[in-house]
Every structure is written in structure tokens, then in C-alpha cells.
Amino acid sequence: MDFINSYEDANRAAAYSTLQFANTYFLAYRDLPAIIAHHVAGKRALDFGCGTGRSTRFLQALGFDVIGVDISEDMVRLARDTDPSGDYRLIPGDDFTGLGVGNFDLVLSAFTFDNVPGGLKGRIISDLGKLLTPKGAIISIVSSPEIYTHEWASFSTKDFPENASAKSGDVVRIIVTDHHDRRPVEDILCTDDTYQEIFANAGLNAIQTLRPLATRSESYTWSNETTVAPWVIYVLKRAS
């Protein structure tokens, strides 16, 4: 199956701009303030793959001076419309020229690598590592392989039984149910073993790996989130 970047689409961007920090998405962000406070000292941040600016505004609320970057013109336009005072930049592919080597205390990547195919992941992660200050950190939130084989408060995969036999690098499909655009999103499955190999080749260490689970005390109607982690959060630092 050929891969299509589902988010280079004006209608998809408009739907994506309505997403909040609710349901399954809540678990991706719930623990970030504590994770960031533990691993990040400075306040200069890059939101890589900022989309319509949801994660960028999240970092702003934590006191960061943030630049949001994305390859989608529609996404960046909507981010600027929502947050006119924010710094949102359209970048061509994986060209980080102008962002500054060693300039960022934090690089956040929320779900971006789900849509990055093949060997491009490794090159981008390596280049992002070069943007870090000596003690800086990359925090990368990615979909767990299990997200593509279960039902969730924010997603459905029941129409795609072929996901169950997918291997790392294969195209998988999922439907976001938290907005009105119910067209399937195509992602690239990537296992933990593959990510760990990519990190090592990029000269980065995964110093913490988290798989957040929901609790029954939270004010959402969970499907599988209390027993199966939909997300994996990697905290990466330069190898010494």
C-alpha cells in the first residue's frame, strides 16, 4: 500500500483544528508538565509538527518561548489564525535551516512521527538532536502499535482488521472519532525496537519511556485506555 500523508489536506486540517485535550488525547498530555519539569531546565522550545498549534499553545501555557513548525500550509495558516501572536513557521520537508543549532532546551514532537515514513524518521530525529542545547531534551509522543488494533474513546480501528498483521514500517489505518472528518488516517507502524534503533543511530538515548494508562477517576468514558496504552512517550537526550 502506498503511503499518503493524510494531514496535507485542507478539510482534514480544519477538522484537526477542533481537537482539544480530551478523551484518548488527554492521556498524551496529562503527564507532560511533570515530565518536562523533571527533564527540561530552560524555556526555549520547538514544537516539531505543530499542526494547528494545539501543542504549541500547551507549551506556551507552561511558560515556554515556543516556535511551532509544520510542513502543511493549511495547518500553519490555521495555527496563526487561532493564535496570531504565536510564532508558527512553514518549513519545507525536514529543512531546519534557520532554527539554530544548539538553540532549544526542549523539542516536542506530538504524534508527528506517526506520519513519517521509512528512513526519513532517522534523519529527522538526528537533525532535531542537533537543535538541542547540551542538556536539552526531545520529548516524542507516538502511537503505540496497540492503538491500531483496539477501540478507543477518540479512535476506531474495527474496520481495519489488516492492522493486526502489520509489521514495523507498514501502513496502518485509524479513524479519529473526536471530530467530524471520519476518513481513515494512514500512519506508519513503528515498534519500540525500531524506535530504539533509530534513536541509537541518531546519537540519542531514551532516558525515559512512558506508556500512560487512564484511571477510572478521570471524567471520560474509556474503552481500553485503562488497560492498554494508546501512546508511548520517549524522553531523549544526547548520548554522552
What would you call each of these model-derived segments?
Residues L106-L120:
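A short SAM/SAH-binding and catalytic strip from SAM-dependent methyltransferases
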Residues A202-S240:
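C-terminal lobe and adjacent flexible extensions of AdoMet/dcAdoMet transferase-like proteins
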Residues G42-R44:
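Nucleotide donor/acceptor-binding cores
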Residues G122-P134:
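A short glycine-rich, Lys/Arg-flanked "PGG" loop and its adjoining helix->strand segment in the class I
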Residues I138-E197:
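SAM-dependent methyltransferase
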Residues M1-V40, R54, F58:
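Conserved class I S-adenosyl-L-methionine
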Residues G98-V107:
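A short acidic, Gly/Pro-enriched loop at the edge of an enzyme's catalytic core
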Residues L46, T52-F96:
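Class I SAM-dependent methyltransferase SAM/SAH-binding core
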